[in-house]
Amino acid sequence: MARLRVSTTVEAPPDDVWADLADISSHVEWMRDAVAIDFTSEQHQGAGTTFACATKVGPFRLTDHMEITAWSPGQAMGVRHVGLVTGDGTIRLRARRRGRTKITWSERLVFPWWMGGPVGAVVATPVLWWVWRWSMRNLRRRFA
Protein backbone atom coordinates (compact mmCIF):
# COMPACT_ATOMS: atom_id res chain seq x y z
CA MET A 1 0.00 0.00 0.00
CA ALA A 2 1.24 3.46 -0.89
CA ARG A 3 0.68 6.10 1.79
CA LEU A 4 1.19 9.70 0.81
CA ARG A 5 0.71 13.02 2.55
CA VAL A 6 1.52 16.47 1.21
CA SER A 7 0.64 19.90 2.59
CA THR A 8 0.85 23.52 1.64
CA THR A 9 -0.44 26.83 2.98
CA VAL A 10 -2.30 29.22 0.69
CA GLU A 11 -3.03 32.93 0.97
CA ALA A 12 -6.81 32.55 1.16
CA PRO A 13 -9.40 31.64 3.80
CA PRO A 14 -10.87 28.10 3.87
CA ASP A 15 -14.17 29.15 2.27
CA ASP A 16 -12.35 30.56 -0.78
CA VAL A 17 -10.18 27.45 -1.06
CA TRP A 18 -13.25 25.25 -0.72
CA ALA A 19 -15.05 27.16 -3.49
CA ASP A 20 -12.17 26.24 -5.81
CA LEU A 21 -11.88 22.61 -4.63
CA ALA A 22 -15.65 22.07 -4.87
CA ASP A 23 -15.39 22.53 -8.64
CA ILE A 24 -14.13 18.99 -9.21
CA SER A 25 -13.90 19.48 -12.98
CA SER A 26 -11.26 22.20 -12.40
CA HIS A 27 -8.91 19.76 -10.63
CA VAL A 28 -7.27 19.02 -14.00
CA GLU A 29 -6.02 22.63 -13.94
CA TRP A 30 -3.80 22.03 -10.91
CA MET A 31 -3.40 18.26 -10.46
CA ARG A 32 -0.22 17.37 -12.30
CA ASP A 33 -1.34 13.82 -13.16
CA ALA A 34 -5.00 14.54 -14.03
CA VAL A 35 -5.70 14.80 -17.76
CA ALA A 36 -9.52 14.78 -17.91
CA ILE A 37 -12.49 14.28 -15.61
CA ASP A 38 -15.74 12.76 -16.84
CA PHE A 39 -18.61 12.60 -14.38
CA THR A 40 -20.44 9.28 -14.17
CA SER A 41 -23.16 10.58 -11.85
CA GLU A 42 -25.72 13.28 -12.51
CA GLN A 43 -24.44 15.31 -9.58
CA HIS A 44 -21.06 17.03 -9.87
CA GLN A 45 -20.59 17.96 -6.20
CA GLY A 46 -21.14 16.37 -2.82
CA ALA A 47 -20.92 12.92 -1.31
CA GLY A 48 -21.95 10.26 -3.81
CA THR A 49 -20.54 12.08 -6.84
CA THR A 50 -18.74 9.63 -9.12
CA PHE A 51 -16.32 10.31 -11.94
CA ALA A 52 -13.60 8.84 -14.10
CA CYS A 53 -10.29 10.70 -14.05
CA ALA A 54 -7.86 10.03 -16.88
CA THR A 55 -4.38 10.21 -15.34
CA LYS A 56 -0.86 10.22 -16.71
CA VAL A 57 2.44 9.90 -14.86
CA GLY A 58 5.32 9.74 -17.30
CA PRO A 59 4.51 6.99 -19.83
CA PHE A 60 1.88 5.42 -17.55
CA ARG A 61 -1.79 6.16 -18.19
CA LEU A 62 -4.91 4.85 -16.53
CA THR A 63 -8.44 5.88 -15.76
CA ASP A 64 -9.03 6.28 -12.04
CA HIS A 65 -12.68 5.69 -11.07
CA MET A 66 -13.59 7.63 -7.94
CA GLU A 67 -16.46 8.41 -5.62
CA ILE A 68 -16.69 11.40 -3.30
CA THR A 69 -17.23 9.92 0.18
CA ALA A 70 -17.04 13.02 2.39
CA TRP A 71 -18.07 16.59 1.69
CA SER A 72 -17.72 19.10 4.52
CA PRO A 73 -17.67 22.60 2.99
CA GLY A 74 -14.68 24.60 4.16
CA GLN A 75 -13.20 21.57 5.92
CA ALA A 76 -12.69 18.31 4.02
CA MET A 77 -13.36 16.28 0.90
CA GLY A 78 -12.95 12.51 0.88
CA VAL A 79 -12.59 10.21 -2.11
CA ARG A 80 -12.62 6.46 -2.68
CA HIS A 81 -10.66 4.98 -5.59
CA VAL A 82 -12.66 2.06 -7.00
CA GLY A 83 -10.91 1.33 -10.29
CA LEU A 84 -7.70 -0.53 -11.09
CA VAL A 85 -5.99 1.27 -8.21
CA THR A 86 -8.08 1.20 -5.03
CA GLY A 87 -7.86 3.14 -1.80
CA ASP A 88 -9.01 6.38 -0.26
CA GLY A 89 -7.91 9.95 0.13
CA THR A 90 -8.80 13.15 1.93
CA ILE A 91 -8.10 16.81 1.34
CA ARG A 92 -8.41 18.72 4.62
CA LEU A 93 -8.51 22.47 5.11
CA ARG A 94 -7.42 24.18 8.32
CA ALA A 95 -7.73 27.91 8.96
CA ARG A 96 -4.48 29.68 9.74
CA ARG A 97 -3.78 33.18 10.97
CA ARG A 98 -4.02 36.17 8.65
CA GLY A 99 -6.72 34.55 6.49
CA ARG A 100 -4.57 31.69 5.25
CA THR A 101 -5.42 28.00 4.88
CA LYS A 102 -3.33 24.88 5.37
CA ILE A 103 -4.27 22.19 2.85
CA THR A 104 -3.30 18.59 3.62
CA TRP A 105 -3.80 15.87 1.01
CA SER A 106 -3.53 12.28 2.27
CA GLU A 107 -3.93 9.11 0.20
CA ARG A 108 -3.74 5.36 0.75
CA LEU A 109 -3.53 3.46 -2.53
CA VAL A 110 -3.42 -0.26 -3.30
CA PHE A 111 -1.92 -1.34 -6.62
CA PRO A 112 -3.09 -4.48 -8.47
CA TRP A 113 -0.70 -7.41 -8.89
CA TRP A 114 0.02 -6.53 -12.53
CA MET A 115 1.24 -3.08 -11.41
CA GLY A 116 3.59 -4.74 -8.94
CA GLY A 117 1.24 -4.91 -5.95
CA PRO A 118 3.13 -3.99 -2.73
CA VAL A 119 6.46 -3.74 -4.59
CA GLY A 120 4.86 -1.40 -7.12
CA ALA A 121 3.60 0.71 -4.23
CA VAL A 122 7.13 1.04 -2.84
CA VAL A 123 8.43 2.15 -6.24
CA ALA A 124 5.47 4.44 -6.95
CA THR A 125 5.34 6.23 -3.59
CA PRO A 126 8.27 8.65 -4.12
CA VAL A 127 7.16 9.36 -7.69
CA LEU A 128 3.59 10.04 -6.64
CA TRP A 129 4.78 12.15 -3.71
CA TRP A 130 6.71 14.35 -6.16
CA VAL A 131 3.73 14.57 -8.54
CA TRP A 132 1.34 15.48 -5.73
CA ARG A 133 3.78 17.95 -4.22
CA TRP A 134 3.94 19.65 -7.62
CA SER A 135 0.12 19.60 -7.72
CA MET A 136 -0.03 21.34 -4.34
CA ARG A 137 2.33 24.04 -5.63
CA ASN A 138 0.00 24.52 -8.59
CA LEU A 139 -2.97 24.79 -6.24
CA ARG A 140 -1.14 27.32 -4.06
CA ARG A 141 -0.44 29.47 -7.13
CA ARG A 142 -4.17 29.74 -7.79
CA PHE A 143 -4.40 31.88 -4.63
CA ALA A 144 -1.22 33.95 -5.05
Enumerate the language-model features and the residues they cover.
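Hydrophobic ligand-binding cavity/cleft-lining segments
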Residues: M1-T40
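Well-ordered beta-strand positions in beta-sheet-rich domains
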Residues: R5-S7, T63-H65, D88-T90, S106
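Solvent-exposed residues in well-ordered beta-strands and their adjoining turns
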Residues: T9-P13, A54-G58, T69, R94-R96, ...
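Short, solvent-exposed helix-to-loop capping segments enriched in aromatics
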Residues: A19-A34, G48-F60, V127
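Short, intrinsically disordered, mixed-charge
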Residues: A19-S26, R133, R137, R141
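Glycine-rich portal/gate segments that line the openings of hydrophobic small-molecule binding cavities
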Residues: D38-D88, R97-R100, W134-A144
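Beta-strand/loop substructures that line and gate deep hydrophobic ligand-binding cavities in soluble
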Residues: R80-W134
